[in-house]
């Protein structure tokens, strides 16, 4: 679905583990990495689209994860002009995304990128929480930063949150 402003309705998915790391996926046949994401079909809610994309791209179901949060607002990015398909109707100039933070509740061996009809990814790894913001393609960077900032306090392991909340005495 494309909205009246030319943005494709989409979901972004951040999967975290119990160590505060996030799932980082390598795009099929490319050297670029990103979070799982995908379009919202007509008649689908963002949550339904998220679970469909999660299964198609990562092979996980609603039983394998727990929803920790979803973004308060839709986050948008524009595509570089060279990536816009000007001959398509309607023209899509970017993505309008609802983001979800999930916690993996199953063994990571259940991750299977071959479940969908055409795989989106051919590799993955756990990375530190803020790593994706520095590594994602530049036109997605601001949306990643905003989503990750919104989810940060919920994704960090409890111990790290507790330490960050302590006041530090200054000397001198």
Curated annotation (Swiss-Prot):
GO terms for molecular function: mRNA 5'-diphosphatase activity. The keyword Acetylation does not apply. Pfam families: NUDIX (PF00293). One of its GO terms (biological process) is mRNA catabolic process. It is an enzyme of class 3 (hydrolase). Keywords: Hydrolase. Its cofactor is a divalent metal cation. PANTHER family: M7GPPPN-MRNA HYDROLASE. Accelerates the degradation of transcripts by removing pyrophosphate from the 5'-end of triphosphorylated RNA, leading to a more labile monophosphorylated state that can stimulate subsequent ribonuclease cleavage. This is RNA pyrophosphohydrolase. The gene is rppH.
């Amino acid at each position: 679905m494309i909205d009246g402003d030319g943005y494709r309705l989409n979901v972004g998915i951040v999967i975290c583990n119990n160590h505060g790391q996030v799932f980082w996926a390598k795009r099929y046949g490319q050297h670029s990495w990103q979070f799982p994401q995908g379009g919202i079909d007509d008649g689908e809610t963002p949550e339904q689209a998220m679970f469909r994309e999660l299964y198609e791209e990562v092979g996980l179901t609603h039983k394998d994860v727990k929803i920790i949060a979803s973004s308060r607002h839709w986050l948008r990015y524009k595509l570089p002009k060279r990536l816009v398909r000007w001959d398509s109707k309607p023209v899509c100039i970017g993505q309008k995304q609802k983001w979800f933070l999930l916690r993996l509740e199953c063994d990571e061996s259940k991750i299977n990128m071959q479940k969908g009809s055409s795989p989106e990814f051919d590799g993955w790894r756990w990375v530190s929480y803020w790593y994706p913001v520095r590594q994602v393609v530049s036109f997605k960077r601001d949306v990643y930063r905003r989503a990750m900032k919104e989810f940060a306090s919920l994704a960090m392991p409890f111990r790290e949150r507790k330490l960050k909340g302590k006041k530090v005495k200054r000397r001198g």
